Regions:
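Conserved small/polar residues in nucleotide/adenosyl-binding loops
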Residues: 253-255
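N-terminal, charged/glycine-rich beta-strand/loop interface patches
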Residues: 2-172, 176-178, 186-207, 212-219, ...
Length: 255
């Protein structure tokens, strides 16, 4: 038994734009299946980096969780399961899904083979949790895949201001452990700013943070020391992250 894959990674129209561990991001440089009617539009799309991408996962005895509905095809001795560990785990993950809007019950694949996700115009961002103090919270809808040694749970905003007037949501999906995770984002890695805090403070005017270390304290505060100062600055309320950890923020667009 065995398999070989042709005209995929070795395709002259395909580029590997990112590769970490078992995860590899495949990008189609041009849409060669376009018609005469949409050729001009597809040309300008490719010039502006609007290209189809797929996440390729190579398993050699490892296991991985993938967002439901994301898998397009897989080959090899790969087995799929729900990854649930009894009724208690099922109830816990069902509750987490209700409060975050993000299902924590992800299809689990393990074995030896290759898995490829559905094509997407979005960008795949591969992050290592070792760079996030072992735990990162992410905005809803960004999760794509992770190694199964990464635990998916919910994290509740601790501060009253963050719960009541913050725009990050009351609960967020939290990824904990040691391993790599993949986020599906509207912007490429080149337009994401990484800020490492060392017992310091980051203030952001708006929902530009897409991921942050769980141990950071999140609050919503006035931009100035007084109401008049905040009004004069025109900034009003800002999202504040304090402590030691990492924040990943968008530089050009709003969530």
């Amino acid at each position: 038994m065995g398999f070989q894959i042709f005209n995929f990674e070795d395709n002259s129209n395909v580029s590997v734009v990112s590769h970490k561990g078992i995860f590899k991001v495949i990008q189609y440089d041009k849409d060669l299946s376009c018609t005469a009617d949409d050729a001009q539009m597809k040309f300008y799309m490719s010039q502006m980096n609007v290209k189809k991408r797929q996440l390729m996962i190579t398993l050699n005895g490892e296991s991985v969780n993938i967002q439901p509905g994301a898998m397009q095809w897989y080959v090899g001795d790969v087995h799929q399961s729900t990854g649930l560990k009894g009724i208690g785990d099922t109830i816990k993950k069902f509750f987490n899904a209700q409060v975050t809007g993000e299902s924590t019950i992800k299809p689990q694949y393990e074995g030896t083979g290759v898995i490829v996700t559905e094509p997407s115009y979005k960008h795949y961002i591969i992050e290592d949790l070792d760079d996030w103090n072992g735990a990162m919270c992410v905005e809803d809808g960004l999760y794509c895949a992770s190694e199964t040694k990464v635990n998916l749970s919910t994290s509740m905003i601790k501060s009253v201001s963050g719960q009541t007037i913050g725009d990050e949501g009351l609960f967020n999906l939290c990824l904990k452990g040691s391993g790599k995770v993949v986020l599906e984002c509207n912007v490429p890695q080149e337009e994401l700013i990484t800020i490492d805090l060392h017992n310091d403070t980051l203030k952001i005017d708006g929902s530009f943070a897409i991921a942050w270390s769980e141990n950071l304290d999140f609050t919503v505060e006035r931009s100035g020391k007084t109401l008049i100062g905040s009004a004069m600055s025109g900034e009003g309320l800002v999202n504040v992250y304090r402590g030691t950890g990492r924040v990943l923020i968008l530089s050009l667009i709003h969530i």
